[in-house]
Amino acid sequence: FQMQELHRQYEDYCIELGIESYLLGARYSKFGYYGESFFDVKYRALEEEQQLTETLFQFLTSMTMREIKLQDEELLFESCQQFIGLWWQEGYEKGERRYRLKLH
């Protein structure tokens, strides 16, 4: 039971940060709609995106029950970056589509 509860906490927090990242991308999509390139918008949001990545990484490393090797830690950080980045991009694309369709 305890392990199942721990997994649920991991899932809930990951989902929460995925949603935050999605909403962040959607919020920044207005800049893309008004003509900024995707990469310029991504750079504009970089600090907030990095904060979400750091938050997720810190949570996952603080919840482990064993010492993490440096190599594993680097892989985990990269996974956190990809997770946050993919949800940011998904939110950005959907948000830009909403702007084009005048649904904002």
Question: Where on the chain are the PLM-derived regions?
Answer:
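Intrinsic-disorder/low-complexity detector
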Residues: 1-104
